[in-house]
Amino acid sequence: MIKFNGLDRIYDAYSWRITHRAKQVWKTGNVVGNRHVEGSYVDQFETSVAKYTKRKYAVAVGSGTDALYFALRAKGIGPESTVACPAISYLATAEAIKRTGATIHFVDVDNKGLISKLPGFGLPDAVVYVNLFGNLADYSILKEFCIKRRIPLIEDAAQSFGSFYNLEQRRC
């Protein structure tokens, strides 16, 4: 039988690290800390992610759905808004948009499941760009389109975290 994916190989390679870290967290009980205790594992995680992605900040949230929701709300997306997102994605993408009260415009994708252009339905208030199956596309055209029109472009990197594009400094 040919497996759809070989996650067992990845687990075998990293399981000792995962188990070791989990034991440390369970032993200390200091997962999120509190306002009087600094240096929790969440703080360490946020610092590491910010450094890895070359961003000033990173904020850990409960799920990727929450991350998308908070990003949309931070850009002012709400009940009167329209948001474009790929027609092929995980349910969380549409769910996060729907939670804001915005109208979703599903956009066709290319053969890798990535948005390559926006259709002529009018300008959306935001675009959620989803990297599927670990693929990163050259989204420079979409980015340029959004920048020129001051449309927020939110990248959903849940399936591509840690990926590089053309070995450049752009990390998800």
What are these regions (language model features)?
Residues 1-78, 100, 129:
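Conserved PLP-binding active-site segment in aminotransferase class I/II-type PLP enzymes
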Residues 3-8, 32, 89-92, 162, ...:
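Generic, ordered loop/turn and secondary-structure boundary motif
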Residues 6, 154, 160, 170-172:
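Structured catalytic cores of enzymes that bind and process phosphorylated ligands/cofactors
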Residues 19, 144, 168-169:
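Residues in and immediately flanking transmembrane alpha helices
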Residues 24-25, 30, 116, 169-172:
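Short, intrinsically disordered, charge-balanced linker/junction segments flanking boundaries
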